[in-house]
Amino acid sequence: MAAMTAIALSLAPLVSASAAGGAPSMDANTDITDQTSLQSGARVFVNYCMGCHSMEFMRYSRMAQDIGLEEDVVAKNLMFNTDKIGDSMTIAMQADDASGWFGVAPPDLSVIARARGVDWLYSYLLTFYADSDPARPFGVNNLMFPDVGMPHVLWPLQGVQSYVKAERPADVDSEHIEQLEADDKGIRVRTAVTTKDGKTTHVLDMLEVTTPGTMQPGEFRKAVRDLVNFLDYAGEPAKLVRFEMGYWAIILLAVFAILARALYKDYWRDVH
């Protein structure tokens, strides 16, 4: 219980800050029964997220079993902080050091998908963009989480993304993002702009990759989807068992219904 409380408190700044602003989420379309996706997501998590974020409720051995990897493969490719397959996915970084470097200790991500939802996480990881404001400590901002304090750790894959805004009226009073939509060039940002006289116009902004990374936009979105899929699985591994049991339960009920129908017809054959 103490561990759950600590994680909930560590996630509180993320939840409250994102709730105060941001944009509507895009659909993540994850599927935790897709083992190939889970394996890809685990690889991205270990290589790009686990330098700062732990996942202490997940053990390497459980992960290997659930996502279809041999333990020796996990030990060779996904374990860098321990040599014991039964250990939890913790990190070497100390919370005090992290607070000094980032202003706040990066949260454990064991239940982040349950706290924020897969659609929000997917959209958040796709909408980092370069921000030259000196107040931005890592030179980036985020549409889902304005004034984010986290660096864009996936930039080697995505590249540097710029927020290209369409022309606005001169007397803008307020504006808000209505929809995000991914395409081959980047992410279309449909924005409603209200002027001081109360009139609202709609403009189309863009998030565009201006300095390419190692992946094309479609490839990067797939990598992010796989990562979010893995985070969704990690938040509740028992869902995999429930899904499998559910399939068998449906099959059993279907067979029972067929047998019950046949028995019913046999009982009433002479009556009719």
Describe each model-derived feature in a short phrase:
Residues 17-43, 54-65, 235-243:
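Electrostatic cytochrome c docking/interface patches
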Residues 45-56, 227:
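The canonical Cys-X-X-Cys-His
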Residues 68-183, 205-220:
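Electron-transfer interface patches adjacent to heme c in soluble/periplasmic c-type cytochromes
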Residues 1-7:
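Bacterial N-terminal signal peptides that target proteins for export
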Residues 242-272:
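Juxtamembrane interface at the cytosolic side of transmembrane helices
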